[in-house]
Design a protein with these regions (language model features):
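Active-/binding-site microenvironments in catalytic and ligand-binding cores
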Residues: 1-242
């Protein structure tokens, strides 16, 4: 296996304070505020010797993040200590969600089992990176709250698990419908929870795949801080195979 390490493809969204930060789930904007020491903000511009800020954010609601089964289980199962390696063979696929009218008269945009069967073919990747194509590919700076974003069918996630996909990455706020009554059927299907407690699989949401990157096989580097939490901000990176 030969990989072009000189040209990393960053799939993460930047995290910054204030308006214009990508967010979802009705969370407040990210805050980055200087610690006040002896009545003075710890900012070089204010005369301090260093910049020293506290950051308040939500991993699920502010930008690219990776989560463990702890997201839907009574136990936390920290994502920070899960992985015993950080490089995985990955496949990038582009999918145009199917418009589906609900009983309430709402139009959902659904990634189906058929979509993924066709896109993946006979190749079984360790990691699947899904780029949605739905007329609006902008991700950075978008507030997804209340927009009924596209989502995956539970059957699609169940199938991904059955063929051996370990890491699922997508450019949406969630694998599940924004308002589903708390069912989180796709999350449960991918992790087979509560039947099992799967500590090998992760879901990464709110990535951004550059337009110029073509579908195909890559090496994925999946890194995130050692947070003892069900989710952590992450920086997935693709490398082209040569």
């Amino acid at each position: 296996l030969k990989v072009d390490l000189a040209k990393p493809i960053d799939l993460s969204l930047p995290l910054h304070a204030g308006e214009g930060q990508t967010r979802a789930w009705w969370v407040d904007p990210v805050s980055m505020e200087a610690v006040v020491w002896e009545g003075r903000p710890m900012l070089v511009a204010e005369g301090s010797s260093v910049n020293f800020c506290s950051i308040r954010f939500n991993p699920h609601g502010h930008g690219t993040h990776t989560e463990s089964v702890g997201h839907i289980s009574p136990e936390v199962h920290p994502v920070g200590g899960m992985l015993d390696r950080y490089f995985f063979l990955a496949q990038l696929v582009s999918v145009r969600p199917l418009d589906r009218r609900t009983a309430e008269g709402v139009t959902d945009h659904v990634i189906t089992l058929g979509h993924l069967r066709e896109a993946i073919g006979d190749r079984i990747p360790e990691a699947l990176v899904i780029r949605t194509v739905n007329g609006d590919n902008a991700r950075d700076g978008r507030d997804w709250s209340g927009s009924n974003p596209p989502y995956l069918e539970a059957q699609a996630c169940e199938w991904l698990r059955s063929i051996g996909v370990l890491h699922l990455l997508l450019d949406l706020p969630s694998v599940d419908r924004e308002s589903d009554g708390g069912a989180l059927a796709a999350h449960h299907a991918f992790w087979d929870h509560p039947n099992t407690v799967d500590l090998k699989r992760t879901i990464t949401e709110l990535i951004q795949v550059p337009r110029e990157v073509v579908d195909g096989d890559y090496l994925l580097e999946l890194q995130f801080p050692h947070f003892m939490n069900d989710a952590a901000p992450s920086r997935p990176v693709l490398y082209a195979l040569i």
